[in-house]
């Protein structure tokens, strides 16, 4: 059986990257929440 996680840097960035988060209102909310929490890394 093949593994379900087949990593791809491009897909990772496109789905979870900073620019993708900034492109939607809810994504910006996610970043704001992570800043408020004091996360060192905001996005993938």
Curated annotation (Swiss-Prot):
Q: Which InterPro entries match?
A: Ribosomal_bL34 (IPR000271), Ribosomal_bL34_CS (IPR020939)
Lineage: superkingdom: Bacteria
Transmembrane regions listed in the UniProt entry: none
Question: One cellular component GO annotation, for this chain's record?
Answer: ribosome
Please tell me whether the keyword Ribosomal protein is annotated for this protein.
yes
GO biological process: what's one of them?
A: translation
| Region (Disordered), start-end ranges | 1-44
Q: Which Pfam families match?
A: Ribosomal_L34
Q: Keywords for this entry?
A: Ribonucleoprotein, Ribosomal protein
In the record, what terms sit under GO molecular function?
structural constituent of ribosome
> What NCBIfam families is this protein classified in?
rpmH_bact
Q: Which PANTHER family match?
A: LARGE RIBOSOMAL SUBUNIT PROTEIN BL34M, MITOCHONDRIAL RIBOSOMAL PROTEIN 34 FAMILY MEMBER
The record's family statement is:
Belongs to the bacterial ribosomal protein bL34 family.
Q: What is this protein called?
A: Large ribosomal subunit protein bL34
Q: Which species is this UniProt entry from?
A: Streptococcus mutans serotype c (strain ATCC 700610 / UA159)
Question: Corresponding gene?
Answer: rpmH
């Amino acid at each position: 059986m093949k593994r379900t996680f087949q990593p791809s840097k491009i897909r990772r960035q496109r789905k979870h990257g900073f620019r993708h988060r900034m492109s939607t209102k809810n994504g910006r909310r996610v970043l704001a929440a992570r800043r408020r929490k004091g996360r060192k890394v905001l996005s993938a």
